[in-house]
From Swiss-Prot:
Protein's name in the database: Beta-ketoacyl-[acyl-carrier-protein] synthase III
Function, in words: Catalyzes the condensation reaction of fatty acid synthesis by the addition to an acyl acceptor of two carbons from malonyl-ACP. Catalyzes the first condensation reaction which initiates fatty acid synthesis and may therefore play a role in governing the total rate of fatty acid production. Possesses both acetoacetyl-ACP synthase and acetyl transacylase activities. Its substrate specificity determines the biosynthesis of branched-chain and/or straight-chain of fatty acids.
Pathway where this protein functions: Lipid metabolism; fatty acid biosynthesis
SUPFAM superfamilies according to UniProt: Thiolase-like
Comment, domains: The last Arg residue of the ACP-binding site is essential for the weak association between ACP/AcpP and FabH.
Gene: fabH
Entry keyword Lipid metabolism: yes
GO BP annotations, alphabetical order: fatty acid biosynthetic process
Class of enzymatic activity (EC top level): transferase
Signal peptide boundaries: none
Amino acid sequence: MAFAKISQVAHYAPAQVVTNDDLSKIMDTSDEWIRSRTGIQERRISLNENTSDLATNVAYQLLEKSGLSPEELDFVLVATISPDNSMPSVAARVQGTIGAVNAFAFDITAACSGFVFALATAEKLIKSGAYKKGLVIGAEVLSKTLDWSDRATAVLFGDGAGGVLLEESEEEHFFGESLNTDGSKGGLESGASAVISPYSDGTEQPNPYMQMDGKAIFDFAVKTVSKSIKALVEEKGEPDYFLLHQANIRILDTMAKKIDVSRDKFLANMMSYGNTSAASIPILLSENVANETLKLGSDQTILLSGFGGGLTWGSLIVKI
C-alpha cells in the first residue's frame, strides 16, 4: 500500500517589512494597541510580487532542495484566497512557470484552513497509488485585498508563502485527520462582488475588501476548534508540537489551556509575519525545520491545524 510523507519544506516572504509603528503613520492605531491584542509586531508586504510569484519561489526551492526535475512532479496544489486572477489558477501559473509539464494543478480555497485541506487532499492522491510526487503550497498576497483605512482588519494580515514536497513512502506518516466546514457562519468575507448583468437591477454595491469579525473568529477558534483538536489528540495521542494557524497569540494561549497541553508545544511566528492565511502553517513549519526545532526524517509528530473563513477548520497529525 502506498503512503505519503513530507520530504522537503520551504518558505518565502517579500522583503518589505511593515512594523506596527509604520502602520500608526497611516491609520489610527499604535504598536501597543496591535501588539496587546494580537501579538503581531510586524508583517511582510509585497511591493510588486503577486501570489503566483511567491508560490513559484517556494516551488523552485522545493525542487532545488530535493534534486527533482519539474517533469517528475505529478501535481501542484496551491491553497489561497488571494489569487492573481479568477483564472488561471495560481497552481496553474506555478506549474507553467517551473515547467512541471506532467503535473496537473489546481487551487483550493478554504481561507486559513486551506493548507491543511490541500495537504489532506494531496495525501489521498498519493495514497491512491496513482501519483508519487507533488507540491502543496499555501500562498497569499493579502495586502491587495485590504482596506488600509480599516484598522480592525488591515493591521492583522501579511503576505507570504510556504510549502512542502509530498512523496510516496513505504511507511505511514499521516496518523490523524479532522476536516470540517460550517457554511452557515461565514465569519470572513473577501472581495464581495455585485451581481451585475444586463438583466439585473444594478442596485447591489460591491465591497472589494476583506472584512472579518475578529471576535466571532476568536470565539469560534477557542471553542469549536479547540474541541476538535482535543478530540483528535485524545484519539491519536499527543504530538511533539502543535503548529496552528497564526492568527493571534491570544488564541494560542487559550487553545493550550483548553486542550490541556503545555504552551511550550505551540510554535509561533505571527509576531514577524502577521496572519498570512493559507501560508501561515507552511511558513511556520519551514522556519522551524530551518532552526532545527523540527527535523525531517525523524520520528517527531506534529499537529497542523487551520481555522478561518467559511467557516472552515481542519487538523492533521503527521510524523515528519
